[in-house]
């Protein structure tokens, strides 16, 4: 989770970097990012509290999206007693700014426990849930997708992917930006979110088929 301290100076670089984000290779890092700075830990704590739906024990597929300027969100799949559910939970605004984490002004400090998220959920077939989980598995188990990126980006989204669909399966990775393979997960993750909000199922199926073709499934 990257510092926003210098956001003002990098804002003008956003559009130039965005065009280059879809790099020629992925730079996934295994597990979840190890946070050390106090402001990073506070931001992460707020995200996990406000968007707590994304970390419930029934979640078997997850994509956490932490943008530099827009609202944080989590899209995923939950395995419930009634079957599978696609969901999206999103903050009402960028929590970094909502909570005044980058400000020394005490008047801007807010209690994240009072912030209410937006939440959408919708049933999903087991077959489609399994296909989506297979996409996450393909990307997260391919060692070629793990590579240390020497650059430091403060103007792009950070994504964390997780899948625990199969017995004893627990795969997690994070990345700043995206590459040709993790980009497919972004498109499917956003299609899942749209499905949860009522978009036609065919749109999600189309996104899954396209990702399967790109990833060779």
Locations of regions flagged by a protein language model:
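N-terminal secretory signal peptides that target proteins for export/translocation
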Residues: 1-2
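Sec-dependent N-terminal signal peptides
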Residues: 5-13
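Function-determining sites in protein domains
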Residues: 22-217
């Amino acid at each position: 989770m990257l510092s926003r301290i210098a956001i003002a100076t990098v804002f003008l670089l956003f559009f130039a970097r965005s065009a280059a984000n879809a790099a020629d290779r992925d730079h996934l890092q295994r597990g979840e990012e190890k946070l050390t700075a106090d402001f990073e830990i506070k931001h992460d704590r707020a995200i996990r509290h406000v968007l707590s739906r994304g970390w419930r024990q029934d979640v078997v597929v997850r994509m956490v999206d932490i943008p530099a300027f827009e609202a944080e969100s989590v899209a995923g799949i939950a395995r419930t007693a009634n079957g599978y559910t696609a969901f999206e939970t999103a903050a009402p605004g960028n929590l970094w700014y909502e909570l005044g984490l980058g400000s020394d002004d005490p008047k801007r400090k807010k209690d994240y426990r009072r912030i209410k998220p937006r939440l959408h959920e919708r049933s999903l077939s087991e077959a489609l849930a399994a296909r989506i989980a297979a996409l996450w598995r393909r990307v997260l188990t391919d060692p070629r997708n793990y590579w240390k990126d020497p650059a430091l980006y403060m103007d792009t989204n950070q994504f964390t992917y997780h899948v625990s669909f199969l017995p004893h399966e627990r795969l997690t990775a994070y990345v700043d930006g995206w590459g040709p393979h993790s980009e497919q997960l972004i498109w499917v993750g956003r299609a899942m979110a749209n499905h949860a909000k009522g978009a036609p199922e065919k749109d999600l199926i189309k996104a899954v088929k396209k990702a399967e073709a790109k990833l060779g499934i």
